[in-house]
Design a protein with these regions (language model features):
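Bacterial N-terminal signal peptides that target proteins for export
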Residues: 1-5
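Asp-box/BNR beta-propeller blade signature and adjacent active/binding-site loops
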Residues: 21-420
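Boundary at the C-terminal end of the N-terminal hydrophobic targeting segment
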Residues: 14-22
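Bacterial N-terminal signal peptides
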Residues: 6-15
Length: 420
């Protein structure tokens, strides 16, 4: 996010590492892709002609960076970013002249008026995804509010993380630290209908930081957030894990992870045996912690270059990784039956196809064992794509014999009207 073109195509001391781990194996499984086609299963939650947000200063048709959650009451929520482009910082823009010209050439729409940039919005379904409410504002700070993600706690508090983006500074460093890209959190105490007005700033050891979610509720009821950011010593970007034991009021840094290259868009999960696993963009680095995040194995790659990985542990213990693929494109998925040490996929360097889209998929497991997945159609880099972007959804099931995946119809196929 610090340099948007990457998305288009005191020093921090990292936590000590556990014994280095060899890279995971990939078991290639021919015939494991779904027989049902994505276009026969997907539906649109928000997009052209479907449940668009009401106009606001700075809205130009872009929607994306979304995430779902299923609440204990049965309601489903999907949060997303709405703005005018792939990134929607407030105007007047804060970009170095060269970067601004590159972004305008790429498709940043000239002449936009967006006093507070993009905002985070939310929709709700009370009938298991068949119909959805009109989008309403979740949070609108002075910055672009990106990648809202959720977790519901034991007491039904709903915690939401997001990060803010103001643009890019001359020379790479803002003179005003308040302009930096930063992770924030807000809470709801009524099932996501109202939210705290003043976000909590996550204090990290980085000069800037980001998170895409998902937040992770641990077996003991505490919550993890995985972030990436720039250490004060300079690049490459590192990953870190923080934990809250008091419903998101405060957060403690557990450990940081570094490699010889950037670790971005990091994701973490708790395995059935209590071990934690983390993955990151762009090289698909994976590492594990056996001591609750204090130390981590050395990050290793295994040929799966990916963007926006998201890890989920299913009820049967299967570890699933949604990701965008650098080698084949599209939103894809692979899964593991042994905590990420062996992955099942259709190829050594790509997962099973979910849809030929830009990716950035997030998921939630449903009572029937299938996954409800939300994702965006395009990255919104080109102006026409930004003006007509859509948030899609689909369902997916790992086959009972683990021979691959099956795509299933989205709950709202044929249901497009928002609920009152």
């Amino acid at each position: 996010m610090k340099a948007l073109l990457v998305l288009a195509c005191g020093a921090l001391t990292a936590a000590s590492t556990q014994a280095a781990s060899s890279g995971p194996d990939v078991v290639v499984l021919p015939g494991g892709d779904s027989k049902a086609r994505p276009e026969d299963c997907r539906a649109i939650l928000v997009g052209p002609g479907t449940n668009q947000p009401d106009p606001f200063p700075g809205y130009g048709g872009f929607v994306g960076w979304e995430s779902p959650v299923r609440l204990k009451c049965g309601d489903w929520l999907v949060g997303f970013n709405a703005g005018y482009w792939h990134a929607s910082p407030p105007t007047p823009w804060h970009y170095p002249a060269k970067a601004l010209q590159e972004y305008l050439k790429l498709g940043l729409p000239a002449g936009i008026v967006a006093p507070t940039g993009g905002r985070a919005m939310i929709i709700r379904s009370t009938d298991e995804g068949k119909t959805w409410s009109k989008p309403v504002t979740l949070i609108d700070t002075p910055a672009d509010d990106r990648h809202p993600a959720f977790v519901e706690l034991r007491d039904r508090t709903v915690l939401c993380s997001f990060f803010t983006y103001m643009g890019e500074p001359e020379g790479g460093v803002w003179s005003d630290p308040a302009m930096e890209t930063r992770v924030h959190l807000i809470r709801s105490f009524d099932g996501g209908r109202t939210w705290e007005k003043k976000p909590l700033l996550l204090h990290t050891p980085f000069t800037y930081d980001e998170t895409d979610g998902p937040l992770v509720k641990l077996k003991d009821g505490s919550v993890l957030i995985a972030i990436n950011g720039r250490p004060r010593s300079g690049p490459p970007d590192q990953a870190a894990v923080m934990r809250s034991t008091n419903r998101g009021r405060s957060w403690k840094l557990l450990g940081a992870i570094r490699a010889a290259h950037d670790l971005q868009e990091v994701t973490v999960a708790e395995l059935p045996g209590g071990e934690w696993v983390m993955m990151a963009r762009p090289e698909g680095d994976i590492c594990w912690s056996r001591d609750k995040g204090r130390t981590w194995t050395e990050p290793v790659t295994f040929g799966m270059r990916m963007l926006a990985p998201s890890l989920y542990v299913l009820r049967d213990g299967t570890l699933l990784c949604l990701h965008g693929s650098y080698t084949r494109g599209g939103l894809r998925v692979m899964f593991s039956r042994n905590g990420g040490h062996t992955w099942i996929a259709p190829g050594k360097d790509f997962g099973f196809l979910v849809d030929q889209s830009y990716g950035y998929g997030k998921a939630m497991e449903l009572p029937d064992g299938s996954l409800f997945i939300t994702y965006l159609a395009t990255g919104g880099h080109h102006t026409p794509d930004a003006q007509s972007n859509a948030i899609r959804c689909i369902r997916l099931r790992v086959r009972p014999d683990y021979s691959g995946i099956d795509l299933l119809p989205a709950p709202n196929r044929g249901h497009v009207a928002p609920i009152p």
